[in-house]
Every structure is written in C-alpha cells, then in structure tokens.
From Swiss-Prot:
Top-level taxon of origin: Bacteria
Protein name: Large ribosomal subunit protein bL33
NCBIfam families: PRK00595.1 (NF001860), rpmG_bact (TIGR01023)
Coiled coil: none
Xref: PROSITE patterns: RIBOSOMAL_L33 (PS00582)
Lineage: Bacteria, Pseudomonadati, Pseudomonadota, Gammaproteobacteria, Vibrionales
GO molecular function: structural constituent of ribosome
GO biological process: translation
InterPro entries given in the database record: Ribosomal_bL33, Ribosomal_bL33_CS, Ribosomal_bL33_sf, Ribosomal_zn-bd
Pfam families in alphabetical order: Ribosomal_L33
GO CC list: cytosolic large ribosomal subunit
Gene expressing this chain: rpmG
C-alpha cells in the first residue's frame, strides 16, 4: 500500500502561551515549514503560528 501525501503537523503559538492547533498538510505541495496567523485564546489576539512536529 502506498504512503499518503498528507502529514500531521502541530501549529505552535509564537506568543509562548503553550497553545497549539493540530492539522495536516500535503508535503508534496508545501515542502517548507507552514506559518499562519490564527487566534490564540490565551492572549485573545491573532498571532503567528509556526509548524512543529507531533511527537
């Protein structure tokens, strides 16, 4: 069976609150690290989230 193109990732807040989102991405279409602005409920603001590996 073939390996899937999608990989599970964790998006960690850059506000150092410890909050994170989990999602998946297509590693063929997006080979680099994902960065996206999302809402951090701890600081109640939109902040930058950076990709990290799920352990």
């Amino acid at each position: 069976m073939a390996k899937g193109a999608r990989e599970k990732i964790k998006l960690v807040s850059t506000a150092n609150t410890g909050h994170f989102y989990t999602t998946d991405k297509n590693k063929r279409n997006m080979p680099g690290k994902m960065e996206i602005k999302k809402f951090d409920p701890v600081v109640r603001q939109h902040v930058l989230y950076k990709e990290a590996k799920i352990k």
